[in-house]
Amino acid sequence: TAAADAEAGDTLEMKYAKLLTIVKHGDGEGASGAAEGVDYQYAEALVANPWKAGTMLHRYILIPKGEEGDKTVVMLAKRRSTGARCTTDTVRTPVERSAVFIAPHCQLMYELGCQQAIRGVCDLDYINIPDVKKRAALSGNTSAQNPIVNCGSSMAPDIERIIALKPEAILLSPFENSGGYGKLDKLHIPIIEAADYMESSPLGRAEWMKFYGMLFGNEEGKSNGISGSCEPKADSLFAKIEKEYLSLKAQAAGYRKGLSILTERKTGNVWYVPGGQSTIGILLKDANARYIFEDDQHSGSLAMSPEQILAKGKQVDVWAFKYFGGAPLSQAQLLQEYDGYKALAAFNRGNIYQVDTSTVPYFELTSFHPELLLREFIILAHGERFGKLRFYKK
């Protein structure tokens, strides 16, 4: 079982991530080729089910490519029982061909230097990474190097295109009660369920990059264009992000309590706002900003009526929200959307900040870089002593 293996292995320290456990087994001695420099015979990544406490969502056995890895595959096949408590996939590493359904993970792969392993994407229109667009435009050009295939919508991907890609892994976002992945499940390609977005700790999600670093490369200067070693790069990048985040948090704590911030706008008859223990709720707290739902204990979104928001948040100082496409929304346009916005003090004072996620790589950059979003909220709450806003515009 996973628990028995974990006892025998070397468990990596996860300081913030609650949904991911990584256990390394063996010392990797005798490894050669693609596996050279790997400090384990195989590794186990256990993803906890975010929607059902005490259960596992998925289990991955990462086995380096090469002859030693081939022997490990045979050895584990003999040893393992078939009674696993969750889906188990064996992934040979480094993964050199993948279909990546999630834009922030594409961005992370560029930062780790393993972008050439991206061979297919979904929801191309929503990806704010110029090189991905450029490589996707080369799709169908037989002489092009490392083109990217547009695999359609992540909700209904083009199965034929994915089969033609021959990916070694598919990265996607799992959802509660999804009932599986339909035809994707039948391809017998490892599906990496990237549940990192369900981590409530901002640094918890970022810490998952250690897992992705292990997936996408260990050998220096690979011939397919994967430069450097993704695993140590991920470790050092996370250490840098953590240091910057904690430094910003400490600086913000030295100021008086900041302005109150309200996020998002009304959608239909509902106004979704972050729970007090959600990623955004924690970011606002760490920015030493005031938040009308800071005492709430939910780690997800709160579905509120507009009347509930206005009753509690009329005196809010700053209103910051995201929108997709088109020009920034004027106050007149916002009132056309919902006349009740005029009851907000922030609206009347003109303290409205917007970010267009169709042109600004907000999700791509902030998902694994919480320090960038923390800085943004600190500026909104305490003024520009921390510099200029990067994402939001007044």
PLM region descriptions:
Residues T1-K394:
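N-terminal ligand-binding lobe of clamshell/alpha-beta domains
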